[in-house]
Amino acid sequence: CSRGITGWKSYKRENALNTQENTHSCLKSVVCDRKLFNFKDYPRPKHSWEETIIYELHIKSFTELIDKNESCFKKFLKKIPYLKELGITAIELLPIFCFDPTDAPNGLENFWGYSPINWFTPHFEYFSDESAEKNREEFRRLVEECHKADIEVILDVVYNHTSEGDSQGPAISWKGIDENLYYFIGEDKNYQDVSGCGNTIAANRGLVRKLIIESLKCWSSEFGVDGFRFDLGIALSRGENLSPLENPPLFEDIDCEPELIDIKLISEPWDCGGLYKLGNFPSKNT
């Protein structure tokens, strides 16, 4: 799966809404070195849940008042002493998956990032330049410095839907590869939606859950991330026809994955389809 994306300067979301040729304005994948995180020099802090104090932040807004000429991730390094002084043990970064800033109505900007177009790549706007390799190194450095300060890094991850919208939305990634595999689609050919964003990922189908597991492993082993908070996590427990599953295969895979054993897992226990599992979440480790 692509670890890097390029083409943002020429990207136009509207050109992916129909069947016209859009090679000149679509995003391109970049092959990157899958370098593993250096846990020997920057080991995980591994704070117990009892002593964990989480500081949730958006990387762009948190660093907005610092030097405008530096990237968000570089500016964040200057704030680590402040976070350490607060006494927190972990930061929870609001979505940093690559997302579409133009996925917003009436010419507005999508600021928060809850509209991913790739589950393996950090968002381009938070870096110094467009080099995918340099971007990966920059985020890895952030995690290294947090570990040095005894601070864990938790990511707010969005696997329940994507930026491709409903059946009339743009074909950016998953939709163009195999929309019938990745999304729940009704007999009327319309996308079924319990995310409130136009589509819902069919997370318990074999190839889809494998992709999600590989994404989690990527952030854990290649970037050194210490935990994940699943946006609308209970939506990931739905099976065919959006039926809730008692033992969702995805959660079983996460629970049994050796590379995720020491990872902190947090989840929202609800979705926009009315499913609510507070205190009864179908995963032993979440």
Predicted feature residues:
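Internal hydrophobic scaffold segments of catalytic domains
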Residues: 1-10, 91-93, 160-161, 273, ...
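The feature marks proteins involved in alpha-glucan
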Residues: 1-52, 64-68
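Intrinsically disordered, low-complexity boundary segments flanking structured domains
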Residues: 16-19, 38-45, 106, 169-170, ...
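Substrate-binding/active-site clefts of carbohydrate-active enzymes
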Residues: 49, 58-74, 78-224, 232-259, ...
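Generic enzyme active-site microenvironment
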Residues: 54, 154, 229, 266
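Polar, glycine-rich mid-to-C-terminal structural blocks
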Residues: 246, 251-255, 262-286
